[in-house]
Curated annotation (Swiss-Prot):
This is Inosine-5'-monophosphate dehydrogenase. K(+) binds at G350, G352, C355, S528. IMP binds at S353, D388, G389, G390, G411, S412, Q473. InterPro entries: Aldolase_TIM (IPR013785), CBS_dom (IPR000644), CBS_dom_sf (IPR046342), IMP_DH (IPR005990), IMP_DH/GMP_Rdtase_CS (IPR015875), IMP_DH_GMPRt (IPR001093).
Protein backbone atom coordinates (compact mmCIF):
# COMPACT_ATOMS: atom_id res chain seq x y z
CA UNK A 1 0.00 0.00 0.00
CA UNK A 2 1.32 3.47 -0.92
CA UNK A 3 2.26 5.61 2.07
CA UNK A 4 0.22 8.82 2.24
CA UNK A 5 2.60 11.71 2.88
CA UNK A 6 2.05 15.03 4.58
CA UNK A 7 0.67 17.37 1.89
CA UNK A 8 2.65 20.30 3.30
CA UNK A 9 5.83 18.47 2.28
CA UNK A 10 4.90 18.18 -1.42
CA UNK A 11 7.52 20.69 -2.63
CA UNK A 12 10.24 19.00 -0.59
CA UNK A 13 9.30 15.56 -1.91
CA UNK A 14 9.44 16.91 -5.47
CA UNK A 15 13.17 17.54 -4.98
CA UNK A 16 13.71 13.79 -4.61
CA UNK A 17 13.18 13.34 -8.35
CA UNK A 18 16.46 13.51 -10.32
CA UNK A 19 15.03 15.70 -13.12
CA UNK A 20 11.93 17.61 -14.02
CA UNK A 21 8.95 16.06 -15.73
CA UNK A 22 9.29 15.61 -19.48
CA UNK A 23 12.41 15.80 -21.63
CA UNK A 24 15.38 18.13 -21.97
CA UNK A 25 15.48 19.67 -25.45
CA UNK A 26 18.63 17.73 -26.36
CA UNK A 27 16.94 14.45 -25.42
CA UNK A 28 13.85 15.42 -27.36
CA UNK A 29 15.84 16.16 -30.51
CA UNK A 30 18.18 13.16 -30.27
CA UNK A 31 17.82 11.98 -33.85
CA UNK A 32 19.57 8.69 -33.09
CA UNK A 33 16.58 7.69 -30.96
CA UNK A 34 13.68 9.70 -32.33
CA UNK A 35 14.63 10.64 -35.87
CA UNK A 36 14.44 14.27 -36.95
CA UNK A 37 11.35 16.04 -35.63
CA UNK A 38 9.12 18.84 -36.79
CA UNK A 39 6.73 21.08 -34.86
CA UNK A 40 3.78 18.68 -34.61
CA UNK A 41 5.95 16.00 -33.00
CA UNK A 42 6.27 17.59 -29.56
CA UNK A 43 4.75 19.88 -26.96
CA UNK A 44 6.20 22.27 -24.38
CA UNK A 45 5.27 21.48 -20.79
CA UNK A 46 3.63 24.18 -18.64
CA UNK A 47 5.52 25.98 -15.89
CA UNK A 48 4.36 28.32 -13.12
CA UNK A 49 2.33 31.48 -13.77
CA UNK A 50 3.48 34.39 -11.61
CA UNK A 51 2.71 37.32 -13.94
CA UNK A 52 0.07 38.46 -16.42
CA UNK A 53 0.30 37.81 -20.14
CA UNK A 54 0.37 41.56 -20.76
CA UNK A 55 3.68 41.70 -18.85
CA UNK A 56 5.39 39.34 -21.32
CA UNK A 57 7.94 41.13 -23.51
CA UNK A 58 8.53 39.81 -27.03
CA UNK A 59 11.43 42.14 -27.87
CA UNK A 60 13.93 40.27 -30.02
CA UNK A 61 16.86 40.80 -32.33
CA UNK A 62 16.51 40.01 -36.02
CA UNK A 63 20.13 40.95 -36.77
CA UNK A 64 23.09 41.87 -34.61
CA UNK A 65 21.98 45.54 -34.55
CA UNK A 66 18.23 45.63 -35.06
CA UNK A 67 15.59 44.77 -32.46
CA UNK A 68 11.84 44.48 -33.03
CA UNK A 69 9.00 44.13 -30.52
CA UNK A 70 7.13 41.26 -32.18
CA UNK A 71 9.13 38.20 -33.37
CA UNK A 72 7.31 37.99 -36.69
CA UNK A 73 8.51 38.52 -40.27
CA UNK A 74 6.74 38.28 -43.61
CA UNK A 75 8.46 36.27 -46.33
CA UNK A 76 10.00 37.84 -49.46
CA UNK A 77 7.54 36.11 -51.79
CA UNK A 78 5.79 37.92 -54.62
CA UNK A 79 2.36 36.96 -53.26
CA UNK A 80 3.22 37.93 -49.68
CA UNK A 81 5.34 41.06 -49.23
CA UNK A 82 5.35 44.33 -51.10
CA UNK A 83 5.32 47.81 -49.56
CA UNK A 84 1.81 47.55 -48.07
CA UNK A 85 2.66 44.38 -46.15
CA UNK A 86 6.07 45.76 -45.13
CA UNK A 87 4.50 48.96 -43.79
CA UNK A 88 1.89 47.18 -41.71
CA UNK A 89 4.25 44.50 -40.42
CA UNK A 90 6.57 47.26 -39.18
CA UNK A 91 3.68 49.23 -37.67
CA UNK A 92 2.59 46.11 -35.76
CA UNK A 93 6.06 45.46 -34.34
CA UNK A 94 7.37 42.95 -36.87
CA UNK A 95 9.30 43.23 -40.12
CA UNK A 96 8.35 42.78 -43.76
CA UNK A 97 10.91 41.63 -46.33
CA UNK A 98 10.08 43.03 -49.77
CA UNK A 99 10.45 40.44 -52.55
CA UNK A 100 12.84 40.91 -55.47
CA UNK A 101 10.83 39.33 -58.28
CA UNK A 102 10.44 42.74 -59.91
CA UNK A 103 12.64 45.34 -61.62
CA UNK A 104 15.17 46.98 -59.26
CA UNK A 105 13.56 50.41 -59.62
CA UNK A 106 10.17 49.00 -58.61
CA UNK A 107 11.63 47.33 -55.54
CA UNK A 108 13.49 50.52 -54.60
CA UNK A 109 10.25 52.47 -54.94
CA UNK A 110 8.58 50.06 -52.51
CA UNK A 111 11.40 50.58 -50.01
CA UNK A 112 11.02 54.33 -50.44
CA UNK A 113 7.30 54.11 -49.68
CA UNK A 114 8.01 52.22 -46.45
CA UNK A 115 10.62 54.73 -45.34
CA UNK A 116 8.37 57.72 -46.08
CA UNK A 117 5.31 56.25 -44.39
CA UNK A 118 6.00 57.20 -40.79
CA UNK A 119 8.58 59.61 -39.54
CA UNK A 120 9.46 61.86 -36.65
CA UNK A 121 11.31 64.69 -38.31
CA UNK A 122 10.93 64.02 -42.03
CA UNK A 123 14.41 64.82 -43.28
CA UNK A 124 13.61 64.33 -46.97
CA UNK A 125 10.02 65.51 -47.45
CA UNK A 126 8.40 65.76 -50.85
CA UNK A 127 8.75 69.46 -51.68
CA UNK A 128 6.96 71.37 -54.45
CA UNK A 129 8.19 74.35 -56.41
CA UNK A 130 6.02 77.43 -57.09
CA UNK A 131 5.64 76.27 -60.69
CA UNK A 132 4.19 72.87 -59.74
CA UNK A 133 0.59 72.63 -60.96
CA UNK A 134 -2.45 71.56 -58.97
CA UNK A 135 -2.74 68.51 -61.23
CA UNK A 136 0.84 67.49 -60.45
CA UNK A 137 0.19 67.93 -56.73
CA UNK A 138 -2.82 65.61 -57.00
CA UNK A 139 -0.67 63.01 -58.76
CA UNK A 140 1.92 63.20 -55.97
CA UNK A 141 -0.80 62.75 -53.35
CA UNK A 142 -2.00 59.62 -55.12
CA UNK A 143 1.55 58.31 -55.53
CA UNK A 144 2.64 58.81 -51.91
CA UNK A 145 -0.74 58.34 -50.23
CA UNK A 146 -0.38 61.47 -48.13
CA UNK A 147 -1.10 65.17 -48.54
CA UNK A 148 0.45 68.34 -47.22
CA UNK A 149 3.41 69.33 -49.36
CA UNK A 150 5.69 72.27 -48.52
CA UNK A 151 6.26 74.77 -51.32
CA UNK A 152 9.72 76.33 -51.40
CA UNK A 153 11.68 78.68 -53.60
CA UNK A 154 13.54 81.98 -53.38
CA UNK A 155 11.45 85.12 -53.77
CA UNK A 156 12.03 88.84 -53.62
CA UNK A 157 8.51 89.62 -52.59
CA UNK A 158 5.36 88.10 -51.07
CA UNK A 159 2.13 90.08 -51.29
CA UNK A 160 0.25 91.14 -48.18
CA UNK A 161 -2.40 88.56 -49.04
CA UNK A 162 0.10 85.74 -48.60
CA UNK A 163 0.08 84.86 -52.31
CA UNK A 164 3.01 85.19 -54.64
CA UNK A 165 3.28 88.61 -56.20
CA UNK A 166 3.02 89.20 -59.93
CA UNK A 167 5.75 87.87 -62.17
CA UNK A 168 7.44 91.24 -62.52
CA UNK A 169 8.15 91.35 -58.77
CA UNK A 170 8.77 87.62 -58.33
CA UNK A 171 12.01 85.95 -59.25
CA UNK A 172 12.19 82.17 -58.93
CA UNK A 173 15.86 81.47 -58.28
CA UNK A 174 15.56 77.86 -57.15
CA UNK A 175 13.19 74.93 -57.65
CA UNK A 176 11.23 73.56 -54.70
CA UNK A 177 13.83 71.78 -52.60
CA UNK A 178 14.81 71.30 -49.02
CA UNK A 179 16.94 74.15 -47.62
CA UNK A 180 15.04 76.67 -49.74
CA UNK A 181 12.75 79.47 -48.59
CA UNK A 182 9.45 78.11 -47.23
CA UNK A 183 6.60 79.81 -49.10
CA UNK A 184 3.56 77.80 -48.03
CA UNK A 185 1.96 74.37 -47.72
CA UNK A 186 -0.44 72.69 -50.13
CA UNK A 187 -2.95 70.47 -48.32
CA UNK A 188 -5.44 67.94 -49.66
CA UNK A 189 -8.25 70.39 -48.98
CA UNK A 190 -6.52 73.06 -51.05
CA UNK A 191 -6.43 70.96 -54.21
CA UNK A 192 -9.30 68.50 -53.83
CA UNK A 193 -12.03 70.56 -55.51
CA UNK A 194 -9.94 73.14 -57.35
CA UNK A 195 -11.45 73.46 -60.83
CA UNK A 196 -8.42 74.55 -62.86
CA UNK A 197 -5.76 71.85 -62.59
CA UNK A 198 -3.24 73.83 -64.63
CA UNK A 199 -3.05 76.54 -61.95
CA UNK A 200 0.22 76.69 -60.00
CA UNK A 201 0.06 75.51 -56.40
CA UNK A 202 0.88 79.06 -55.32
CA UNK A 203 -2.71 79.96 -56.22
CA UNK A 204 -4.16 77.58 -53.64
CA UNK A 205 -1.45 77.02 -51.01
CA UNK A 206 -1.80 78.08 -47.38
CA UNK A 207 0.66 80.78 -46.36
CA UNK A 208 -0.42 81.34 -42.76
CA UNK A 209 1.94 78.77 -41.31
CA UNK A 210 2.92 77.64 -37.85
CA UNK A 211 6.61 76.73 -37.85
CA UNK A 212 9.25 75.68 -35.33
CA UNK A 213 12.91 76.69 -35.35
CA UNK A 214 15.72 74.29 -36.22
CA UNK A 215 17.05 72.71 -33.04
CA UNK A 216 13.58 72.10 -31.60
CA UNK A 217 13.42 68.65 -29.97
CA UNK A 218 10.93 66.05 -31.20
CA UNK A 219 8.94 66.32 -27.95
CA UNK A 220 8.79 70.12 -28.25
CA UNK A 221 7.80 69.92 -31.91
CA UNK A 222 5.07 67.41 -31.13
CA UNK A 223 3.65 69.78 -28.52
CA UNK A 224 3.64 72.68 -31.00
CA UNK A 225 1.88 70.44 -33.53
CA UNK A 226 -0.75 69.41 -30.98
CA UNK A 227 -1.49 72.93 -29.83
CA UNK A 228 -1.54 74.40 -33.36
CA UNK A 229 -4.11 71.87 -34.61
CA UNK A 230 -2.28 71.90 -37.94
CA UNK A 231 -1.58 68.85 -40.07
CA UNK A 232 2.08 69.64 -40.75
CA UNK A 233 4.77 71.49 -38.81
CA UNK A 234 7.64 72.82 -40.95
CA UNK A 235 10.99 73.19 -39.21
CA UNK A 236 12.90 76.23 -40.51
CA UNK A 237 16.29 77.77 -39.83
CA UNK A 238 16.94 81.42 -38.89
CA UNK A 239 16.69 82.44 -42.55
CA UNK A 240 13.31 80.77 -43.03
CA UNK A 241 14.74 77.89 -45.05
CA UNK A 242 12.94 74.56 -44.73
CA UNK A 243 15.11 71.93 -42.99
CA UNK A 244 12.55 69.22 -42.06
CA UNK A 245 8.88 68.50 -41.49
CA UNK A 246 6.69 66.92 -38.81
CA UNK A 247 3.31 65.30 -39.51
CA UNK A 248 0.23 65.07 -37.27
CA UNK A 249 -0.73 61.76 -38.87
CA UNK A 250 2.51 60.29 -37.54
CA UNK A 251 1.54 61.30 -34.01
CA UNK A 252 -1.67 59.33 -34.42
CA UNK A 253 0.27 56.34 -35.71
CA UNK A 254 2.42 56.45 -32.58
CA UNK A 255 -0.76 56.20 -30.52
CA UNK A 256 -2.34 53.41 -32.56
CA UNK A 257 0.87 51.41 -33.16
CA UNK A 258 2.96 51.54 -29.97
CA UNK A 259 5.02 48.47 -30.97
CA UNK A 260 6.09 49.87 -34.35
CA UNK A 261 9.54 48.82 -35.59
CA UNK A 262 11.23 52.19 -35.98
CA UNK A 263 14.66 53.73 -36.13
CA UNK A 264 15.68 56.60 -33.82
CA UNK A 265 14.73 58.87 -36.74
CA UNK A 266 11.18 57.44 -36.39
CA UNK A 267 11.28 55.94 -39.87
CA UNK A 268 9.89 52.43 -40.18
CA UNK A 269 12.42 49.60 -40.34
CA UNK A 270 12.62 48.10 -43.82
CA UNK A 271 14.15 44.92 -45.24
CA UNK A 272 14.31 43.66 -48.82
CA UNK A 273 15.63 40.60 -50.62
CA UNK A 274 18.24 40.28 -53.34
CA UNK A 275 19.68 37.26 -55.13
CA UNK A 276 23.28 36.09 -55.10
CA UNK A 277 23.88 37.23 -58.69
CA UNK A 278 26.36 40.00 -59.47
CA UNK A 279 23.61 41.87 -61.31
CA UNK A 280 21.88 42.43 -57.99
CA UNK A 281 24.77 44.56 -56.76
CA UNK A 282 23.22 47.36 -58.81
CA UNK A 283 19.83 46.48 -57.32
CA UNK A 284 21.23 46.74 -53.80
CA UNK A 285 22.72 50.16 -54.51
CA UNK A 286 19.25 51.37 -55.52
CA UNK A 287 17.72 49.86 -52.38
CA UNK A 288 20.32 51.49 -50.14
CA UNK A 289 19.74 54.83 -51.85
CA UNK A 290 16.03 54.39 -51.09
CA UNK A 291 16.79 53.93 -47.38
CA UNK A 292 17.09 50.16 -46.90
CA UNK A 293 18.12 48.97 -43.42
CA UNK A 294 18.43 45.18 -43.80
CA UNK A 295 19.19 43.09 -46.87
CA UNK A 296 18.11 39.45 -47.07
CA UNK A 297 20.31 37.42 -49.40
CA UNK A 298 17.72 35.01 -50.74
CA UNK A 299 18.65 31.49 -51.81
CA UNK A 300 17.15 28.05 -51.31
CA UNK A 301 20.60 26.70 -50.37
CA UNK A 302 22.56 29.43 -48.64
CA UNK A 303 25.93 27.72 -48.31
CA UNK A 304 27.18 28.54 -51.80
CA UNK A 305 30.25 30.32 -53.10
CA UNK A 306 27.89 32.85 -54.66
CA UNK A 307 26.25 33.83 -51.39
CA UNK A 308 29.52 33.93 -49.47
CA UNK A 309 31.02 36.22 -52.11
CA UNK A 310 27.92 38.44 -52.04
CA UNK A 311 28.01 38.74 -48.23
CA UNK A 312 31.66 39.75 -48.27
CA UNK A 313 31.02 42.33 -51.01
CA UNK A 314 28.07 43.83 -49.13
CA UNK A 315 30.09 44.05 -45.92
CA UNK A 316 32.90 45.91 -47.66
CA UNK A 317 30.65 48.15 -49.77
CA UNK A 318 27.78 48.88 -47.36
CA UNK A 319 29.11 48.39 -43.82
CA UNK A 320 26.01 50.03 -42.31
CA UNK A 321 23.61 47.53 -43.88
CA UNK A 322 22.84 44.39 -41.85
CA UNK A 323 22.69 41.08 -43.73
CA UNK A 324 20.32 38.17 -43.14
CA UNK A 325 21.76 35.16 -44.96
CA UNK A 326 20.30 31.77 -45.84
CA UNK A 327 18.48 29.55 -46.18
CA UNK A 328 20.27 26.88 -44.17
CA UNK A 329 19.51 23.88 -41.94
CA UNK A 330 22.87 22.68 -40.56
CA UNK A 331 25.67 23.94 -38.31
CA UNK A 332 28.14 23.55 -41.16
CA UNK A 333 26.13 25.87 -43.38
CA UNK A 334 25.74 28.33 -40.52
CA UNK A 335 29.46 28.41 -39.82
CA UNK A 336 30.27 29.33 -43.43
CA UNK A 337 27.80 32.22 -43.50
CA UNK A 338 28.73 33.53 -40.05
CA UNK A 339 32.41 33.49 -41.03
CA UNK A 340 31.54 35.47 -44.17
CA UNK A 341 29.92 38.18 -42.05
CA UNK A 342 26.18 37.38 -41.80
CA UNK A 343 24.32 39.40 -39.15
CA UNK A 344 21.35 37.04 -39.05
CA UNK A 345 20.45 33.60 -40.40
CA UNK A 346 17.31 32.27 -42.04
CA UNK A 347 16.55 28.62 -41.29
CA UNK A 348 14.48 26.27 -43.41
CA UNK A 349 14.79 24.09 -46.49
CA UNK A 350 11.78 22.34 -47.94
CA UNK A 351 9.47 22.99 -44.99
CA UNK A 352 7.34 25.78 -46.48
CA UNK A 353 3.70 25.06 -47.29
CA UNK A 354 4.23 25.69 -51.02
CA UNK A 355 7.67 24.06 -51.15
CA UNK A 356 8.41 20.58 -52.55
CA UNK A 357 12.22 20.66 -52.29
CA UNK A 358 12.38 17.71 -49.89
CA UNK A 359 10.14 15.63 -52.13
CA UNK A 360 11.84 16.51 -55.43
CA UNK A 361 15.47 17.07 -54.44
CA UNK A 362 15.59 14.67 -51.47
CA UNK A 363 17.50 17.43 -49.68
CA UNK A 364 16.45 19.41 -46.64
CA UNK A 365 15.68 18.76 -42.99
CA UNK A 366 12.62 18.70 -40.73
CA UNK A 367 12.16 22.17 -39.30
CA UNK A 368 12.36 21.53 -35.55
CA UNK A 369 15.70 19.76 -35.91
CA UNK A 370 16.97 22.52 -38.21
CA UNK A 371 15.99 25.39 -35.92
CA UNK A 372 17.52 23.86 -32.81
CA UNK A 373 20.80 22.83 -34.45
CA UNK A 374 21.47 26.13 -36.23
CA UNK A 375 20.18 28.41 -33.46
CA UNK A 376 22.26 26.76 -30.74
CA UNK A 377 25.38 27.17 -32.87
CA UNK A 378 24.66 30.73 -34.03
CA UNK A 379 23.93 31.88 -30.47
CA UNK A 380 27.58 31.28 -29.61
CA UNK A 381 28.47 34.10 -32.01
CA UNK A 382 25.62 36.43 -31.10
CA UNK A 383 23.91 35.88 -34.46
CA UNK A 384 20.07 35.83 -34.34
CA UNK A 385 18.15 33.21 -36.29
CA UNK A 386 14.82 33.29 -38.11
CA UNK A 387 12.77 30.10 -38.42
CA UNK A 388 11.39 30.20 -41.97
CA UNK A 389 8.79 27.65 -43.03
CA UNK A 390 6.68 24.89 -41.53
CA UNK A 391 4.49 27.34 -39.58
CA UNK A 392 0.85 26.33 -39.85
CA UNK A 393 -0.53 27.90 -36.69
CA UNK A 394 0.23 30.00 -33.63
CA UNK A 395 1.58 27.02 -31.67
CA UNK A 396 4.22 26.38 -34.33
CA UNK A 397 5.48 29.95 -33.92
CA UNK A 398 5.97 29.39 -30.19
CA UNK A 399 7.74 26.08 -30.80
CA UNK A 400 10.14 27.70 -33.27
CA UNK A 401 10.96 30.38 -30.70
CA UNK A 402 11.39 27.78 -27.95
CA UNK A 403 13.93 25.88 -30.05
CA UNK A 404 16.14 28.96 -30.21
CA UNK A 405 14.88 31.12 -33.06
CA UNK A 406 14.82 34.85 -32.42
CA UNK A 407 11.87 35.29 -34.78
CA UNK A 408 9.64 33.36 -37.15
CA UNK A 409 9.04 34.11 -40.84
CA UNK A 410 5.63 33.44 -42.36
CA UNK A 411 4.45 33.03 -45.93
CA UNK A 412 1.13 31.22 -46.30
CA UNK A 413 -0.16 32.48 -42.94
CA UNK A 414 0.03 36.05 -44.24
CA UNK A 415 -0.67 35.45 -47.94
CA UNK A 416 -4.42 35.49 -47.32
CA UNK A 417 -4.44 38.88 -45.62
CA UNK A 418 -5.64 42.12 -47.16
CA UNK A 419 -2.15 43.59 -47.20
CA UNK A 420 -0.56 40.87 -49.35
CA UNK A 421 -0.23 41.57 -53.12
CA UNK A 422 -1.91 38.33 -54.22
CA UNK A 423 -5.15 38.52 -56.19
CA UNK A 424 -8.51 37.68 -54.60
CA UNK A 425 -10.92 35.32 -56.35
CA UNK A 426 -13.79 33.02 -55.44
CA UNK A 427 -12.92 29.32 -55.39
CA UNK A 428 -15.04 26.59 -56.98
CA UNK A 429 -16.47 25.98 -53.52
CA UNK A 430 -17.63 29.59 -53.30
CA UNK A 431 -14.98 30.61 -50.78
CA UNK A 432 -13.03 33.86 -50.97
CA UNK A 433 -9.35 32.99 -51.47
CA UNK A 434 -6.15 34.68 -52.48
CA UNK A 435 -3.49 33.49 -54.92
CA UNK A 436 -0.33 32.15 -53.29
CA UNK A 437 2.68 30.56 -54.94
CA UNK A 438 6.03 29.22 -53.86
CA UNK A 439 9.03 31.01 -55.34
CA UNK A 440 10.23 27.65 -56.68
CA UNK A 441 7.02 27.00 -58.59
CA UNK A 442 6.97 26.90 -62.38
CA UNK A 443 4.42 29.74 -62.24
CA UNK A 444 7.06 32.00 -60.70
CA UNK A 445 10.10 30.76 -62.62
CA UNK A 446 8.37 31.33 -65.97
CA UNK A 447 6.76 34.65 -65.03
CA UNK A 448 8.64 37.19 -67.15
CA UNK A 449 6.10 39.94 -66.60
CA UNK A 450 6.61 40.17 -62.85
CA UNK A 451 10.37 40.56 -63.18
CA UNK A 452 10.04 43.17 -65.91
CA UNK A 453 11.90 40.98 -68.38
CA UNK A 454 15.01 40.86 -66.20
CA UNK A 455 16.38 38.17 -63.89
CA UNK A 456 13.60 36.01 -62.48
CA UNK A 457 13.92 35.86 -58.69
CA UNK A 458 12.35 32.42 -58.46
CA UNK A 459 14.78 30.90 -60.95
CA UNK A 460 17.71 32.71 -59.31
CA UNK A 461 16.74 31.53 -55.84
CA UNK A 462 16.77 27.91 -56.96
CA UNK A 463 19.85 28.16 -59.25
CA UNK A 464 17.68 27.39 -62.31
CA UNK A 465 17.92 30.50 -64.48
CA UNK A 466 20.13 28.82 -67.11
CA UNK A 467 18.40 25.43 -67.10
CA UNK A 468 16.74 24.29 -70.31
CA UNK A 469 14.36 22.21 -68.23
CA UNK A 470 12.96 23.93 -65.14
CA UNK A 471 12.55 21.56 -62.17
CA UNK A 472 9.88 22.86 -59.84
CA UNK A 473 10.65 23.08 -56.13
CA UNK A 474 7.36 24.73 -55.26
CA UNK A 475 3.69 24.86 -56.18
CA UNK A 476 1.12 27.55 -56.93
CA UNK A 477 -2.25 27.54 -55.22
CA UNK A 478 -4.47 29.62 -53.00
CA UNK A 479 -5.09 30.39 -49.34
CA UNK A 480 -8.28 31.33 -47.53
CA UNK A 481 -8.95 35.02 -46.90
CA UNK A 482 -7.79 36.01 -43.38
CA UNK A 483 -8.81 39.66 -43.34
CA UNK A 484 -6.35 42.35 -42.36
CA UNK A 485 -3.07 41.76 -40.54
CA UNK A 486 -4.04 44.68 -38.33
CA UNK A 487 -6.25 42.10 -36.61
CA UNK A 488 -4.35 38.90 -37.37
CA UNK A 489 -0.87 39.93 -36.18
CA UNK A 490 -2.15 41.30 -32.83
CA UNK A 491 -3.83 37.90 -32.35
CA UNK A 492 -0.48 36.18 -32.95
CA UNK A 493 1.31 38.55 -30.55
CA UNK A 494 -1.29 38.05 -27.81
CA UNK A 495 -1.19 34.29 -28.35
CA UNK A 496 2.60 34.17 -28.00
CA UNK A 497 2.36 36.21 -24.80
CA UNK A 498 -0.21 33.81 -23.33
CA UNK A 499 1.88 30.81 -24.36
CA UNK A 500 5.00 32.18 -22.65
CA UNK A 501 2.86 32.87 -19.59
CA UNK A 502 1.80 29.18 -19.56
CA UNK A 503 5.43 28.12 -19.92
CA UNK A 504 6.36 30.41 -17.03
CA UNK A 505 8.80 32.78 -18.75
CA UNK A 506 8.42 36.53 -19.12
CA UNK A 507 10.48 37.17 -22.26
CA UNK A 508 12.20 35.36 -25.11
CA UNK A 509 15.62 35.48 -23.48
CA UNK A 510 14.17 33.70 -20.42
CA UNK A 511 12.56 31.16 -22.76
CA UNK A 512 15.86 30.41 -24.48
CA UNK A 513 17.74 30.23 -21.18
CA UNK A 514 15.08 27.97 -19.66
CA UNK A 515 15.24 25.59 -22.61
CA UNK A 516 19.04 25.46 -22.52
CA UNK A 517 19.32 24.85 -18.77
CA UNK A 518 16.53 22.27 -18.72
CA UNK A 519 13.95 24.24 -16.75
CA UNK A 520 11.64 24.41 -19.76
CA UNK A 521 10.74 20.82 -20.62
CA UNK A 522 9.25 19.03 -23.60
CA UNK A 523 7.21 15.93 -24.41
CA UNK A 524 7.04 13.79 -27.52
CA UNK A 525 3.63 13.37 -29.21
CA UNK A 526 2.47 10.11 -30.69
CA UNK A 527 0.02 10.14 -33.59
CA UNK A 528 -2.77 9.43 -31.10
CA UNK A 529 -1.58 12.29 -28.90
CA UNK A 530 -1.73 14.65 -31.86
CA UNK A 531 -5.30 13.54 -32.55
CA UNK A 532 -6.19 14.07 -28.90
CA UNK A 533 -4.70 17.56 -28.96
CA UNK A 534 -6.96 18.66 -31.80
CA UNK A 535 -10.73 19.05 -31.89
CA UNK A 536 -12.31 15.61 -31.65
CA UNK A 537 -15.54 13.85 -30.70
CA UNK A 538 -17.84 16.64 -31.90
CA UNK A 539 -20.65 16.34 -34.40
CA UNK A 540 -19.69 19.74 -35.83
CA UNK A 541 -17.84 22.84 -34.73
CA UNK A 542 -16.78 26.32 -35.75
CA UNK A 543 -13.10 27.14 -35.27
CA UNK A 544 -12.97 30.89 -34.67
CA UNK A 545 -9.41 31.77 -33.68
CA UNK A 546 -9.85 35.27 -32.29
CA UNK A 547 -12.16 38.22 -31.75
CA UNK A 548 -11.37 41.90 -31.49
Amino acid sequence: MVEILDYTKALEVLKEYPSGDGLHVDTLLDSDNHGALTYNDFLILPGSITFSAADVSLDTKVTRRFTIKAPLLSSPMDTVTEHNMAIHMALLGGLGVIHNNCPPDDQAEMVRKVKRYENGFILDPVVLSPSTTVAEAKELKTKWNFGGFPVTGKTHYLSSFGKLASSDSFSLLEKGTLHSKLLGIVTSRDIQFHKTPEDPVTAVMSTELVTAPAGTTLAEANEVLRSSKKGKLPIVDKDGLLVSLLSRSDLMKNIHYPLASKLPSKQLLCAAAISTHDADKVRLQKLVDAGLDIVVVDSSQGNSMYQIAMIKWIKSTFPDIDIIAGNIVTREQAAALIAAGADGLRIGMGSGSACITQEVMAVGRPQAASVRSVSAFAARFGVPTIADGGVQNLGHIVKGLALGASAVMMGSLLAGTTESPGEYYVSNEGQLVKAFRGMGSIAVMEDKGKSGGGKNAGASRYFSENDKVKVAQGVAGSVVDRGSITQYVPYLVAGIQHSLQDIGVQDLEALHNGVNNGQVRFEMRSASAQTEGNVHGLHSHEKKLYSS
